[in-house]
Amino acid sequence: RSGQRRKDQAFFAVFNDMSTHQSRTTVWPHEVFIREIQSKLTKQEIHDPAAVPLPPYYPDTPVVRKEWARMYDCVTLMDRNTGRLLKELEEDGLADNTIVFFYSDHGTGMPRGKRMLYDSGMRVALMVRFPRCYQHLAPSLPGTVNGELVSFVDFPTTVMNLVGIDKAEYMQGRSFLGGNRDPEPDYIYGCRDRVDEVFECGRSLRSRKYLYIRNYHPHLSHNQPSVFSDLGRTRQEITRLAREDPKKLNEVQMDYAGPEKPAEAFYDCDADPHNLVNLLEGVLTVEQRAAFRAHRLAYESERLRLRDPGAIPEDEMWRWVRDEKTSMYDILLGKSDHKPELAMAWSAADLVGRSDFQTALKLLKSANPIERYWAILALRAGGYEHRDNLVDYLEDISASVRIEAADWLAWGGSGQKAALDRLVKELNHEDWWVALRACRAIELLGEKARGALPAMKKLYLENRTQKGDGPFYLAFSAGAFLDGLGEKTQPWNFAPGAGAFTPEPK
């Protein structure tokens, strides 16, 4: 609502309801959740932990039930807030000529939701309400469910189409609403990369029926340590059970909580909406095998069509941006000194999980640091007998290669001390993203990296109270390492007024 808007003036407004944000559902201390969320509900609206339906990938414990009920309470408040906005449209006489979109940005902020490539992380609610005067722009009748595949990249194009504006040439999305809708795609492409201090690389391809997932760091758990997420009680409970009493977790639950993950996964989303059964771990039917091959080929084609740079290590991208004095966007379009060989980069990445260690050993000698980087990860995913070949790469000209080699070697063997020394040295790198990669490697080493304790203490103290992404993530990772070794750190607090985030506008 704005007093500056003329009565007949068209408007476009976005309301972000934070009631179901990860901070509310799981991260805030429970007493803060009660004060900020639950206190706004009636007694009848508050959910009984004993009665909430748990997803099958969660262990059924009182801790998990309490927090899942908390999530439902957050959803209830969000629902009420949405109703209030719709009522305001009616009160202002705008409901009969306003198209309303309702959607989330990703799956729930609970474990195995947000940040994951499963449907629990990538599939979200999308409802669109057309008033009678605009129902000719809808793809189906009021109250119906439309099963078309839609991606967020389609939203700008669709809104522009609804108001009669042609999409710009550079826009990738299709228009799924309006008089001249674009055809439905066969697939939706999904990405998973570094989040805060947590390094990861995964991709997905979703058709109406199947979900294909490609994991490029299979040596890492789905449930990697993450300071912000680990403040939640459900995460703590799952991690504790996996470490102390794994027999209390079934196979489905250990798929998330276990120490590793498959390089590839394929799910029948119609028969298995929770993505519990990886079809590649059983015998595929003729139809499933054909679908799997089609999805894998389509994924390999789609990543090039979209110019996905995810196979390029972060430090290499930054080096190009600096050397060529332009954006990564222009570099990918070939508007600078060179056009990245994305096909080469992804081909090297595809060696991970394929057991083709002879090709990986050849790429280890490549002049291209991207190929050397992926060769190390490919060997780490099963080629353990080749680990000693990496000692010389601790002095590689590429920071990405040096650190990846050191990360693996530091877990044991003849090169362990030299590898840890390399990681400690990289903590002083001028680029925070390089220092962070080394810091994360040391964090996950835990007790094996006790020799890095003085350097990690120094790094933590230098960054804990500084502003900016780099210091924030470095303090996350270094602090988690110190906590694991029993050192004293300043607890993280993301509750309102704690100062970690700026307050929300009134």
Name each model feature, range by range.
Residues 123, 248-264, 269-274, 281-422, ...:
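Long, internal low-complexity/basic segments
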Residues 22, 107-112, 182-186, 465-468:
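Secretory-pathway/luminal and periplasmic proteins that interact with or process carbohydrate-rich
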Residues 124-126, 185-187, 203, 210, ...:
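Small-molecule pocket liners
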Residues 136, 144-147, 164-174, 184-190, ...:
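Acidic/polar loop patches that form or flank catalytic/metal-binding clefts of enzymes
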